[in-house]
């Protein structure tokens, strides 16, 4: 299961990152439409799966629906805000930099809210991993300052991403505790976190419609005479399905910190692929960053977490 989850994460998430970068280059304010498309596809696929294979999970889910509510609110906010941030002068390289603090945030929140304790090897490896991603990204974001036309807008985007990091760490702990209490079922998690989020999009119908119309406003046509942006959106949505499928499957088998570390390594791989596919030079910074990322990941894999002193309480 873990090997399968990793293949989905690195295959789906890296493909998703490529399509996302191509899309936001032409449509930087398409974040809400991107998120909505992803949620629709994943919900439809999940509904078909359960209707054909496991109707009982729709009637009587392993995890109570009211338990999912807190997770769904955070999950929806994280996904929407992450994509919305790209419209506030946050370039893809900067996006990777700011989100690379995930493992550190997970550790801090885990220590404060759940009383988790981590070994020195884990703390050191996560810190070095984060530094590696930042060095590699900064070394190749040569035009970083050109994207910051307004420090106020950049500050808003930065704040949004900080909030999503904290929410993501809290959500990871809640999910970890939920799986410990009720048992893990990544299929159920994938479906309910997306399906129960759909009503929130009713408040965002106007920007969704506007962003969809923007895709058809360009003159560049692709396959079947559809705008290239539509195809990038379709590819991004499909890739995101495989990405979140892998993340949910991994989260059902491992800790929140392990998921965060794996996603950080994935971000670095996405950066390297972005450099290659967009014909950017892979300079010394990327090579040095690679050494830090993969070296620290190997150290983390060999480290073990100390038992929690006190976990989150069951509160339904």
Swiss-Prot record:
UniProt-listed InterPro entries: SCL35B1-4/HUT1
GO molecular function: UDP-N-acetylglucosamine transmembrane transporter activity; UDP-xylose transmembrane transporter activity
UniProt cross-references to Pfam families, sorted A to Z: UAA (PF08449)
Cytoplasmic-side segments: 1-3, 53-67, 142-153, 209-214, 296-316
UniProt keyword list: Endoplasmic reticulum, Membrane, Sugar transport, Transmembrane, Transmembrane helix, Transport
Known role: Sugar transporter that specifically mediates the transport of UDP-N-acetylglucosamine (UDP-GlcNAc) and is required for cell wall chitin synthesis.
Name of this chain's protein: UDP-N-acetylglucosamine transporter yea4
Top-level taxonomy: Eukaryota, Fungi, Dikarya, Ascomycota, Taphrinomycotina
Gene that this polypeptide is encoded by: yea4
